[in-house]
Amino acid sequence: MAASFSSTAPTTPVLRFRANYSKPLLSLPDSCLRIISSAISPSTRLIACSFKTDKLPLGAGVNLSGGPVVKRSLQKRLVIRSATIEEIEAEKSAIETDVKSKMEKTIETLRTSFNSIRTGRSNAAMLDKIEVEYYGSPVSLKSIAQISTPDGSSLLLQPYDKSSLKAIEKAIVNSDLGVTPNNDGDVIRLSLPPLTSDRRKELSKVVAKQSEEGKVALRNIRRDALKSYDKLEKEKKLSEDNVKDLSSDLQKLIDVYMKKIEELYKQKEKELMKV
C-alpha cells in the first residue's frame, strides 16, 4: 500500500490510499486496517478513523479510492456546566426558607386548634374553626358575624346579615362545642356551662393528640429537607461534610420548634385543668 499527503491543504494533511496499497506512511489503528482490507469497492468507501499523530489530526478523513476527501469527521463534545457558588447557595437558602415556613405554619395550625378547644372561660377563639354554609359556600363564622364576650361564661354573636342566623345556629349545634345556641331573631347567645372533671380529661387527651400530630409534622418536614440535601450531594453540589453540617443545623431548628409545641401544650393543659 502506498500513500501520499495532499499539498492543497498544508494545515490539514490528507491521507490517500491507492487501490494497490502495501504499507501506509502513518500507522493506522487495527480497526481501520480491517475496514480497509474488507472493502469490496474502494471507490465508494469513506473511513473516518479517530486517531491522532504528529501529522494527522484527530478524525481525519480517509478515502479508499485515492480521490479527494469528501467529508471531515466532526467529534461531538458534551459540555457540562458546573453550578456556581451563587446557585448552590440559592438552592440551600430555598430549602431553609421552605423548612421555616412549613414549621411556622405547623405551629400556627396547632395554636388555632388549641384556641378552638373550650376551657373554663369564654373565648372568641373557640369559634375559629366553625364554618357556616352561607349562600351555598362554607365560610368562617367570624367572617359573617361579630363575636364578643359579655362575661366569662358567655359569647354573643351578632351577624352582619340576619338571614344567616339559622345557618349560624345550625353550625354551632353540629360543632363539638357542646353548647346550645339561643337565637332571639337578632343575635345568638352562647352560655357556657362549667366543665366537668370528665370533660376536662377528655379535652386534655384531645390536646395531647393534637400536640403529637404537630411533632410528627415537624419530623416529616425534617425528612423532606434531608432528602433535598442528599439530592444536592448526589449532584456534586454539596460535599458530605456540607450535608452533615446542614443536617446538624436542621436538627437544632427542629428542636426549637419542638420546644414551642411543648410550651403550647403545657399552657393549654394548664387552662383546661384550671377550675
Swiss-Prot record:
Which sequence ranges form a coiled-coil region, renumbered to this chain?
Answer: 215-271
Q: Do you know which Gene3D superfamilies this protein is assigned to?
A: 3.30.1360.40, Ribosome-recycling factor
Q: Any idea which residues the transit peptide spans?
A: 1-82
The Gene Ontology biological process annotation of the record reads: chloroplast organization; defense response to fungus; embryo development ending in seed dormancy; plastid translation
Classification via InterPro entries: Ribosome_recyc_fac (IPR002661), Ribosome_recyc_fac_dom (IPR023584), RRF_sf (IPR036191)
Q: What's a single GO CC term here?
A: cytosol
Annotated compartments: Plastid, Chloroplast
Q: Does the keyword Plastid apply?
A: yes
**Biological function:** Responsible for the release of ribosomes from messenger RNA at the termination of chloroplastic protein biosynthesis.
Q: Which HAMAP family match?
A: RRF
Q: What is this protein called?
A: Ribosome-recycling factor, chloroplastic
Q: Which gene encodes it?
A: RRF
